[in-house]
């Protein structure tokens, strides 16, 4: 069983408490993308990122100084968005950290796909950003089926905890033999099911921590996810979607 999650826009240079254990599988390709980005003007970068002047200046300065081989920190501690805060990987025991290195993959616009302890540097590039590429229509086309192929080499079903933007990099390449299971966290609003992004991000992080803490190996075990906000709904769930409804 392997989980896929989205990265976070907000990144930090993590402390040295947890060392880098591996290098990104597609670091060479990430280097190509970084070089293209470093050639952008300030205005082009701002248009790419859709950021304010202040945030663009910070990100642009960081971009010009970026070197994928220096000052790396483990990916799982470098992303600091809500999902990662609620995952709280720094609170996992050693066995839990081994579990996420084996079972968790982070999809990335720059790096393609990452293991939790792959060494990364802060960057700003979402999969849906319209980076001008010489031989490809967009980043989805650039990455092609490589992210799927990396997952296909791992045994068991794919548990999708990623946003639609990132799951879109995997879905077109799924084969009939693949078991791809979406996880949905929803609220009932006026008789309809609605996803509340912030709460969903929290729950995704908590589910990864739950799986790692209990060393889960079967998708069915996720039904027992102990969430303070959501409860598994067997009536709405199917073989390809696990649905959790707000309590």
UniProtKB/Swiss-Prot annotation:
Q: Which GO terms describe its cellular component?
A: cytosol
InterPro entries cross-referenced by the UniProt entry: YaaA
Gene Ontology BP terms? response to hydroperoxide
Domain of life from the UniProt record: Bacteria
Q: Which PANTHER family match?
A: PEROXIDE STRESS RESISTANCE PROTEIN YAAA, PEROXIDE STRESS RESPONSE PROTEIN YAAA
Report the HAMAP family cross-referenced here: UPF0246
Q: Its family?
A: Belongs to the UPF0246 family.
What's the protein called, per UniProt? UPF0246 protein LSEI_2080
Q: Which organism is it from?
A: Lacticaseibacillus paracasei (strain ATCC 334 / BCRC 17002 / CCUG 31169 / CIP 107868 / KCTC 3260 / NRRL B-441)
